[in-house]
Amino acid sequence: MSAGGASVPPPPNPAVSFPPPRVTLPAGPDILRTYSGAFVCLEILFGGLVWILVASSNVPLPLLQGWVMFVSVTAFFFSLLFLGMFLSGMVAQIDANWNFLDFAYHFTVFVFYFGAFLLEAAATSLHDLHCNTTITGQPLLSDNQYNINVAASIFAFMTTACYGCSLGLALRRWRP
């Protein structure tokens, strides 16, 4: 009892006062039945191929292709984490605006992947450039490295397009 004789009500439990998470995508395996889930799976597949192809070319131009490797590896793991959170149903337990987080993630990765695609295409276009380190003037990229970089450029474009489609879908969910 307080000095005035009236009892003070207990403070509200903070666990009950949080609003529910805002997410319109389904949690669990149902995420794979949506366009967004399919695009995330394609992002992981194509992004992994970009990572593997650039690494298998022995990264002849580390200044350009180092960024491509960083973006593809980082986006690959964050997309796996993103998909894993939806598959496990953790999005229903974490209070966040998942629609905004989905949009912000795909916007950021789209911008970075677009830059990585441009750098990979630029590295591939240097195939006919000759090195001045030898008297014979060997090309900067061997024919094998050139072919691998062409494939990496194509898959980087496809991955960028998938992130762009996911960005459009996320924008529709975030701002209906």
From Swiss-Prot:
Gene Ontology cellular-component annotations: apical plasma membrane; endomembrane system; extracellular exosome; membrane; membrane raft; perinuclear region of cytoplasm
Residues that carry a glycan: N132
Membrane side Lumenal: residue ranges: 56-66, 124-149
Pfam families assigned to the protein according to its UniProt record, in alphabetical order: MARVEL
All copies of domain MARVEL, residue ranges: 31-175
Keyword Endoplasmic reticulum: no
Record's keyword terms, sorted: Cell membrane, Cytoplasm, Glycoprotein, Membrane, Transmembrane, Transmembrane helix
GO molecular function: structural constituent of myelin sheath
Topology feature Cytoplasmic, residues: 1-34, 88-102, 171-176
Intracellular or extracellular location(s): Cell membrane; Apical cell membrane; Endomembrane system; Cytoplasm, Perinuclear region
UniProt superkingdom: Eukaryota
Tissue localization of expression: Predominantly expressed in kidney, lung, and liver. Also found in thyroid gland, stomach and, at lower levels in testis and small intestine.
Membrane topology type: Multi-pass membrane protein
Bilayer-crossing regions: 35-55, 67-87, 103-123, 150-170
GO biological process, one term: myelination
Family, per entry: Belongs to the MAL family.
Function: Member of the machinery of polarized transport. Required for the indirect transcytotic route at the step of the egress of the transcytosing cargo from perinuclear endosomes in order for it to travel to the apical surface via a raft-dependent pathway.
Assembly with partners or alone: Interacts with TPD52L2.
Protein name, entry field: Protein MAL2
